[in-house]
Design a protein with these regions (language model features):
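Short pre-active-site segment immediately N-terminal to the catalytic Zn-binding motif
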Residues: 180-203
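Bacterial N-terminal signal peptides
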Residues: 6-15
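Positively charged n-region of N-terminal signal peptides that target proteins for export
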Residues: 1-4
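A structural motif
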Residues: 158-185
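Active-site recognition of the HExxH zinc-binding catalytic motif
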Residues: 197-215
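Propeptide-to-catalytic entry region of secreted or membrane-anchored zinc metalloproteases
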Residues: 21-144, 148-165, 312, 321-333, ...
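Compositionally biased low-complexity segments at domain edges in trafficked proteins
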Residues: 388-398
């Protein structure tokens, strides 16, 4: 790490989390970033990559535009971490001397049409990793944020961007760039403003996936007070109407590689062996569900999510999140307790209609995540009844 930092300094780069808003940022960016908070320095940083096919060039002024947008998102994450009591922490960014984000430009081996939405990520990631292997001083974490210009053809253009990968895959995520992808349109009641909310909201949302976040919703009372969670439908509200991050999301981020504080030497995501579950209890107490787990001592965070069907990928936006209260038992095990008032599930449509699920996300001290799904039928559980959790079956990742 010291060698990488020394190389970065020689290249005129800095790992500072935030400083004064760069003077060359446009007035709208200056305005939106005027209330920036001082973020804690991080040990690791997001690899930001601008990837173009061999028949395309980057879009005009992409470095300034993407920098303004990314720093705004970094601030949003940091302010939400602080609001949730986890400190002024956000994902680290490597900055150039002029304050722009260090965006790594990679030119693909094939034409831009090869890197299309459905499967284009495969060769893109192969080429990205090959490039970073040749330039290890540029790889500052395992998290890659890949941005591609929209396809310009008979279907896609600046008024209807698309055609490129736009999703999260493990520690990688993809977003797009287009001519009007500019923070000056944020919150504007114009076509460009509405378009920016969609694609900039998606930019922030897919980045969340690349930083280990699953879809999740807030409770009924939280949503009434704060708006829409970013990892629910916040990609359609970001910058336009109140959008927030749940405590469950922020607790996952607190144990993610690019949020690790300066000086941290943890090797992240190395443990793929599920932690032991020593005890589990799931019961209904009147109008509340209660979950208690005793787990291996390396567990540092547990979230409980209640979801109605369907349970397939991208059908979990409405999974209501309940972060567990964490404790340490006399035997040195990790205790986790979730209190789930049924009234807070009011936005779920099928709570009492057949099988729903309790999803448990378990996070270890080096950031690895494991999921355990417990299907149950609430309508068949008496007011003070116990729900069978079955044999613990933990799956790595999410």
């Amino acid at each position: 790490m010291r060698a990488i930092i020394a190389t970065m300094c020689a290249l005129g780069l800095t790992t500072a989390a935030v400083g004064a808003v760069p003077s060359h940022f446009q007035p709208r960016a200056q305005e939106l970033l005027a209330d920036s908070i001082q973020l804690e320095p991080t040990a690791n940083h997001l690899n930001v990559i601008y990837f173009v096919g061999n028949d395309r060039e980057p879009l005009a002024d992409y470095e300034r535009r993407i920098s303004e947008l990314l720093i705004y998102v970094q601030q949003f994450y940091g302010k939400e971490m602080a609001r949730n009591g986890l400190g002024n922490r956000s994902f680290g960014l490597v900055l150039k001397e002029n304050g722009n984000v260090n965006i790594i430009l990679i030119r693909g081996e094939k034409p831009h049409t090869h890197y299309a939405y459905g499967t284009g990520h495969n060769d893109c990631l192969r080429e990205v990793n090959a490039y970073l292997d040749k330039h290890p001083e540029l790889r500052t974490s395992q998290h890659n944020f890949v941005i591609m210009p929209t396809h310009y053809d008979e279907k896609y253009n600046d008024l209807n961007p698309g055609g490129v990968p736009f999703y999260g895959l493990g520690t990688n995520c993809f977003a797009l760039d287009y001519g009007h992808f500019d923070i000056r349109h944020l919150g504007q009641r114009t076509h460009e403003g509405r378009l920016l909310t969609k694609w900039f909201g998606g930019f922030a949302h897919e980045l969340g996936h690349g930083l280990n976040l699953p879809h999740n919703d807030g409770t009924a009372s939280q949503n009434a007070q704060m708006g829409t969670p970013l990892m629910e439908a916040g990609n359609y509200t970001f910058g336009y109407s109140p959008t927030y991050m749940t405590l469950a999301s922020c607790r996952i981020l607190a144990n993610s590689e690019v949020f690790a504080p300066a000086g941290c030497t943890t090797r992240f995501y190395t443990n793929t062996t599920p932690p032991a579950v020593y005890a589990s209890n799931f019961k209904r107490v009147g109008d509340t569900l209660e979950v208690y787990l005793e787990l291996e001592s390396n567990v540092v965070n547990v979230n409980a999510y209640v979801q109605d069907p369907p349970f397939q990928v991208n059908q979990d936006y409405d999974a209501v999140a309940f972060p567990c209260v964490m404790s340490r038992t006399h035997e040195g095990k990790t205790g986790a307790f979730a209190h789930i008032p049924l009234a807070e599930l009011a936005e779920l449509k099928k709570v009492y209609d057949g099988t729903i699920a309790l999803d448990i996300l378990i996070q270890t001290n080096e950031g690895s995540r494991f999921r355990w799904r417990v299907p149950f039928n609430l309508s068949q559980v008496p007011a003070d009844g116990t729900i069978d959790m079955g044999t613990p079956t933990l799956h790595y990742g999410y």
